[in-house]
């Protein structure tokens, strides 16, 4: 059986030592005092470790069952969902007006990582509802908000997003689902959607589907797509539930992972729906949910890496195999523990340095979202737009790789289902695909985000890194951290310059290097985070604050990242500068 322990100490350190929330003027941050955040994180950690994680393997083994049109989730899910709902965890960072607790998104993200690490499939029921509610909050009418949000905030009603159809995934302009206007102002929605997470279940009274469809006679392609609210049960004027709507689950998808989440084929047969936002502006409204979801999916990559690492570390400490090359370290046993061997340590430090750097990056991104949304900071809004594809793509690619490395620590036992390690790998795999496949994230980064607003957001990022290096210093105790970061940042700038010089005359040159650019950017972001953590821990040690062992460990891990992982930027730059020719040399029929 696997275990999960919420990383509360690390999150507290990031909030208060690194992100310095006490001195952040963003509205709502004044209440984020150490005692308060500690209490929230400790309670959330208990739920994650004691309630959600014990159901993780249950969900994987049992999956969901479709019976007479109703999906039954795995044993224990419904009771756990009630417990999460009753504890107020479903609307931690949503507005009080509709029943939320109005805490910063930063704190909600920290709690979300814990829940996702404990049980990703379970947490998706809540997470998708959060995203759907956010879309209604931004684009809905007052009546729609009053009707749906209180129940969705509490998760008495859950939510979904319906985009994909059998013949169209990334290219939603090929969509065939139709929305025919009705005399009462509603629309009759017809079509089939696939891969719909949490599309049907019995853990909530109602399910509010957000569905993309085309109104007949509208513009061709993506410009003709609109977004609709389609409830499972129609809602009466007094808020009570009426008759069943014309939407049903016809099949549960058989998947590689996240078996505990009901991934459904949804059939719409003249279902009653209501326009959310403007006609033919559906993608604008849906992207409110999609952008939030992409941050959440990046979080999933980190979360699965964390839980896999915890179990791999336990195994490396307990499993006796071979002797240390420098001498026996466990004379009373038949062999030394795995963790004495350099390659196992390299493996574990790859994981540890990624996870802790990624957590800092994710929470910094959440802080930027708070500054943009709560503080109306336009610069922060631009930074979030720039970094969203990096958070989604880099964290899920690397997060998946780390679950594989954790599995590798177990050797053959990692390949056996009994240990539970394969579930982390299987569950992590989908995060590289849904909410925009990572190749698409890379194209978005290079094709749109770099040049957005005249390139001022990427220049702001370069200035941020440069400012940190200048302030921290390139000599003294910080030099071993700032010098590698400075070099990596130059690699990122060189890659950006290559795209500027070659992208217009040869678009394939930019597109062929986009994936490497996303990873190069991700490494620089984590390098910046490790620089900030090194600075914070050096300061804490100098002042005699906190746990000295914790801070020394941070510094050792920072050194590992700077010397062993950050140099990957040079590999990515070399690939980018090789241009399109190596990628495009073969005609399609020669593959």
From Swiss-Prot:
State what changing residue 197 to A does.
Retains 3.6% of wild-type activity
| UniProt effect for mutating residue 281 to A | Retains 54% of wild-type activity
The active site consists of 435 (proton acceptor)
Superkingdom: Bacteria
Could you say what the effect of mutating residue 284 to A is? Retains 97% of wild-type activity
The answer to whether keyword Flavoprotein applies is yes
Q: What is the effect of changing residue 280 to A?
A: Retains 18% of wild-type activity
> How is activity influenced by pH?
Optimum pH is 9.0.
Catalytic temperature dependence: Optimum temperature is 40 degrees Celsius.
Cofactor names from the entry are: FAD
Sorted alphabetically, the keyword list is: FAD, Flavoprotein, Oxidoreductase
Q: Note the SUPFAM superfamilies from the entry.
A: Acyl-CoA dehydrogenase C-terminal domain-like, Acyl-CoA dehydrogenase NM domain-like
Q: What is the effect of changing residue 434 to A?
A: Retains 51% of wild-type activity
Explain what the record says happens when changing residue 448 to A.
Retains 44% of wild-type activity
This enzyme catalyses:
3-(methylsulfanyl)propanoyl-CoA + oxidized [electron-transfer flavoprotein] + H(+) = 3-(methylsulfanyl)acryloyl-CoA + reduced [electron-transfer flavoprotein]
Q: What induces it?
A: Expression is up-regulated in the presence of DMSP.
Which positions form S-S bridges? none
Presence of the UniProt keyword Flavoprotein in the record: yes
Record remark: domains: Each monomer consists of four domains: an N-terminal alpha-helical domain, a ten-stranded beta sheet domain, a central alpha-helical domain and a C-terminal alpha-helical domain.
To which protein family does this belong?
Belongs to the acyl-CoA dehydrogenase family.
Binding partners and assembly: Homodimer.
Tell me the protein's name.
Answer: 3-methylmercaptopropionyl-CoA dehydrogenase
Q: Which organism is it from?
A: Roseovarius nubinhibens (strain ATCC BAA-591 / DSM 15170 / ISM)
